[in-house]
Regions:
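Bacterial Sec-dependent signal peptides at the C-terminal "C-region" and cleavage site
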Residues: 1-21
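Residue-level recognition of secondary-structure-to-loop junctions
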Residues: 388-392
Length: 424
């Protein structure tokens, strides 16, 4: 394999902005992130859109995973007074990269050096994210030597911005290797969802004793969810996600201010990952779910917020998702959603049936929402919807989207399996 990259175009010197000095210091028994000498606690969102809203709601930072469109991202962040943790994408071995190949690793480091030199003086830059969950599906410990090589390179060409790398939860072996092999890293970033509430204790038992950032959190991950018998993960309602994330934010971020430098909620925007709603804090049209309201409160927004609708539960054929819903093809069934609006706003319900997504891979960018299955929806009456199951056997989901006319949205879905031979 040959690592090929395009030379990075340098900014004209006359347009070169003035950067900001960012550093991590220890004050007494507490780690503090300083930006131009002032304490800077990260109140962020991970994503590529709605930066103006994030700033308006009290957020101060965004996180992205790679440098595609980095100039646009940094400029947009600067426009709204936000900072950026800018990801430097490092290839993974499962993608064919070999970290035993010293020449290949050197090429990658040189490529990343060009990127660092291009963006290091941008005033919106907060820190560098060196790779993302690099150990996933790989056991080659040489990857951490490469991470340290990149981090050390950054310290030489850009001493004004800290470096971090990202792991999922607190994998004991990998964290130990990071401590031993990556002394040039300043901060550990952790993507945590279901186990986020245990982070302070897990980190205390690990070899990492320095500062950390929660680089992704939000709904329970689909890899942590309960599954149907046909291996479809059961998704929380948007109301459940907000409460789930609120509890974990309080139990980790707010409970460990001596080590935690802040967090990035995931996903600030909309993303198809298993479903179009699993991690999306907003709809494709920008309507906001309950987790946005929770983050506004944590970020200190004092504006009185019109709350999104609340979904208590969704049933299909009088069954919950946990009841393993098998339905015969081309038969009529009834679905019911139980919901209310805190301000008693009038609610509009939209239903749709989608086939189960073929991929359950968060690392696959730009996944497309499956096409809506046509001719499945029959009569709707208030909170009830009748549907006709598809003729084709296989896994599907019934979705409901509830709007209050105030740019708020509540979502829920229930997986079901169409078959001529139901198991129950």
């Amino acid at each position: 394999m040959v690592f090929v990259y395009k030379p990075v175009k340098k900014q004209p010197h006359r347009d070169k902005p003035q950067g900001r000095k960012v550093e991590v210091v220890k004050q007494g028994d507490r780690y503090v992130l300083l930006r131009n000498g002032e304490p800077y606690f990260i109140k962020g969102g991970a994503g590529y859109e709605h930066y103006g809203r994030l700033s308006k709601y009290g957020g101060n930072s965004i996180r992205v995973w790679h440098t595609d469109n980095a100039q646009q991202v940094l400029d947009s962040a600067q426009k709204y007074g936000l900072t950026v943790t800018l990801g430097l994408w490092m290839a993974r071995e499962r993608e064919g990269f070999n970290y035993y190949d010293k020449e290949l690793v050197a090429q990658q480091t040189e490529h990343l050096k060009e990127i660092v030199l291009k963006y290091k003086d941008h005033p919106a830059l907060l820190m560098w994210g060196v790779g993302n969950e690099l150990y996933a599906e790989s056991s080659n410990v040489k990857v951490w030597d490469a991470v340290n090589q990149v981090a050390q390179m950054i310290k030489e060409v850009d001493p004004d911005h800290p470096t971090t790398t990202t792991v999922m939860n607190v994998p004991e072996k990998e964290v130990s290797l990071i401590v031993k092999k990556c002394p040039a890293l300043d901060v550990l970033s952790i993507n945590a969802f279901g186990s986020m509430h245990n982070l302070p204790e897990d980190l205390a038992r690990s070899d990492w004793k320095g500062p950390y950032i929660i680089s992704e959190f939000g709904a329970r991950g689909y890899w942590e969810a309960f599954y149907t018998w046909w291996m479809a993960p059961i998704e929380q309602t948007s109301s459940e996600k907000a409460e789930f994330a609120r509890q974990r934010y309080e139990q980790s971020v707010l409970a460990d201010l001596k080590h935690c430098l802040g967090s990035y909620v995931f996903m600030w925007g909309n993303k198809q990952e298993v479903t179009p709603t699993w991690f999306s804090l907003m709809s494709e049209q920008g309507e906001e779910t309950a987790l946005v309201s929770e983050m506004r409160r944590f970020w200190g927004d004092t504006v009185v917020i019109n709350q999104p609708p609340y979904i208590a539960y969704l049933k299909l054929d009088n069954k919950f998702a946990f009841d393993q819903i098998y339905l015969r093809p081309e038969q009529n069934f009834e679905a019911t959603v139980f919901a209310y609006d805190p301000e008693q706003d009038s609610l509009q319900l939209h239903w749709e049936v989608l086939p189960e997504a073929a991929r359950q891979d968060g690392n696959a960018d730009k996944q497309k929402k499956p096409a809506v299955v046509q001719q499945t929806l029959l009569k709707q009456d208030g909170n009830r919807q009748w549907l006709r199951t598809p003729a084709k056997e296989g896994p599907y989901r019934l979705y409901v989207y509830i709007r209050d006319g105030q740019n708020n949205l509540a979502t829920a879905n229930v997986p079901f399996y169409v078959t001529h031979n139901p198991l129950k």
